[in-house]
Amino acid sequence: NSVPTERLRMATLDVDPEASCSKLSTSPSNTSLTHRFLDNKFYLLVVIGEIVTEDHLRCAISDIERGIRSWDTDLISCNLDQELKLFVSRHSARFSADVRGQKILHHRSDVLETVVLINPSDEAVSTEVRLMITDAARHKLLVLTGQCCENTGELILQSGSFSFQNFIEIFTDQEIGELLSTTHPANKANLTLFCPEEGDWKNANLKKHNLQDFINIKLNSVSILPEMEGLSEFTEYLSESVEVPSSFDVLEPPASGGFLKLSKPCCYIFPGGRGDSALFAVNGFNMLINGGSDRRSCFWKLVRHLDRVDSILLTHNGADNLPGVNSLLQRKIAELEEEQSQGSTANSDWMKNLISPELGVVFLNVPENVTNLQPNFRVRRNTEETCLTLQYLNKLCVKPEPLFRTVGNVIDPVILFQKMGVGRLEMYILNSVKGSKELQFFMQHWSSNNKAKTGLILPNGKDAEISFPYLTSISSLIVWHPANPSEKIVRALFPGNAPQYNILDGLEKLKHLDFLKHPVVTQKELIASSAAPTVKQAKLKQWSDSKESLKSNSRPSVGKGVKKDVKEETPELTKPTAVSHQEAVNEKPQKVEKKEKPVVKKERPRTELQSKPEEKDAKAKADAAKQELEEKMQKDEKLKSESKPKPLKEKIVKKEVKAKKPEEKKKEEKDVKKESAKPDRKEEKAVIKKEKVKKEEKPKKEEVKKDVKKDVKKEVKKKGN
């Protein structure tokens, strides 16, 4: 459609940031009002949105009739009855090569230009509305029919939608702004708008957008015009022109055979319209997350080449994510019906319609007591889409599986797929929480559209609200652990429509997982990082042990080993030592306790005679005799010991009880000094030697005393004589 050159005029505009729409401004004072709308020209634009069933079509045709009759126009200047008959007989039709199912019907007379858009795209609607506003006709009528969204009132199209905001944004176009601002106020265009009575359309405040200063707009006026034969012919023809597409038309079969195999982890994000849709796949398993808001499923061109969709995750019950999946379920039901009706005609063309992926498990949180609601063919409601989903799943014998996060500090994953040599796919549920107040309320009042306050304050000072289906939306983290430890661990977060604080609360319970502590990580790197602290601690312990051993080696040898030897040898020391048979007989048995007595330096026993000066000579003689006797005994003892087998060196020292020679004693004293690190052992040896010498000296002292007494008597006699 080429735009006439007279319509293309420049415009200026001011943007109202609060309203997110434009505010037209007049041209400078020196700019003349050059544009003029023609009072005898009329323009009719009818938009028929997406039609799903025959019931939807009947509602749309009824709204078209109401919309045309609400047009406040002069039937004398424009014989509408006659003009509509001319349209039926003389219109032209154009089809789009890019948009399947889109059709544009057009007729232009000297008085009325009529354009009808059937099943158009959002781009086609915006283009035709622009052309209507810029047309020279002063009297314009825009009729928007079809299903609309529940909350916003957006007109649902086969791809996208047309909202009140889209309508306002058209006036921000520079060309349109210049055109309207250069028109004389007495010659302003008149626009009658028939639109859905829902959402933003219903609450539209045109004065807020300053449009009435440049164009006269009437919204959803009551029926003014009478019933007309031409109008009936017009609506009847449109009902015949609009085709309700079958499931195989909405989701076309693949042009070629064969299936697509996804061997590496991947995630496809599809344009889900007002919602979202994605396909996450690994080698051997795939998951479809939501289906988008379009009936013509955005994921179908890829999914139709798969042999199986292993799982479907529907995060919430909404009209923004269920329609795409419902189309897939509807197609699977149509395949069963087609197969039953066609029988065994395997060579027919209908066989290609049966090429579609098999369906696995479906995850969806819905109450068990869901009842079918009365359908509303003008408004697409969340609850109605949920009912359709459950009906289709029931026909396919598929039971939806619920997903909840259990209450606790740790979230256990759901194992979606696990195969030896391939890997493991886990799913952590972040929201919704089992047993929470929000979930309980949703299960009891699932059909309502109640909202909960979030505690957040909007810029306008009001509390932010969120609907319960969104508050209880499933939010999940999917993690792929490949069998090869050198491959990267893949993590994908699918938040659904859950509030951000609920998602963060769920992630807080996963902070202990090591694979979430790195931006990119492999299993091999995780093992290395976890082993590093252990190795470090082992090295520190080894270093401290070696340091302690160095300290102990640098100390004098008074250590535990010497004490241990002494303890082990103590029983040997308690045994009486036999020097000779005669000594053993003469020796009195002594107790063990005597050996433990401290060493005391013994003094020779004094007598009254020895204390006199004249007895010194006798004492010297006695000492000499004693020394000779000891030397003689040592020689005898040495001969005896040499004839016996030599015991261990340590025991020789301990068992040797004979009196040593002066040279040997000196040598022993030197050895003892060298072994000064062994004081305990030295003491014990000294005690043993003293005790044994004491035993030997007892009989000898008696003999010495007798000799001394004899010598003393002899000396006394000599002096007496």
Curated annotation (Swiss-Prot):
Top-level taxon of origin: Eukaryota
GO terms assigned for molecular function: actin binding; microtubule binding
Region feature (Disordered): 537-721
Pfam families: MAPB1_N (PF23415), MBL_MAP1B (PF25281)
Region (11 X 3 AA approximate repeats): 563-715
Sequence repeats: from-to residues: 563-565, 654-656, 666-668, 673-675, 681-683, 689-691, 694-696, 700-702, 705-707, 709-711, 713-715
Keyword vocabulary terms for this entry: Membrane, Repeat
Subcellular location: Endomembrane system
Chief location bin: membrane
Record membrane topology: Peripheral membrane protein
One Gene Ontology term from the biological process aspect of the record: axonogenesis
GO cellular component: cytosol; dendrite; endomembrane system; membrane; microtubule; microtubule associated complex; neuronal cell body; synapse
Biased amino acid composition, Basic and acidic residues: 562-572, 584-714
PANTHER family, A to Z: MICROTUBULE-ASSOCIATED PROTEIN (PTHR13843), MICROTUBULE-ASSOCIATED PROTEIN 1B (PTHR13843:SF5)
Family indicated by similarity: To T.californica electromotor neuron-associated protein 2.
Note: Has a highly basic region with many copies of the sequence K-K-E, repeated but not at fixed intervals.
Name by which UniProt lists this protein: Electromotor neuron-associated protein 1
Lineage summary: Eukaryota, Metazoa, Chordata, Craniata, Vertebrata
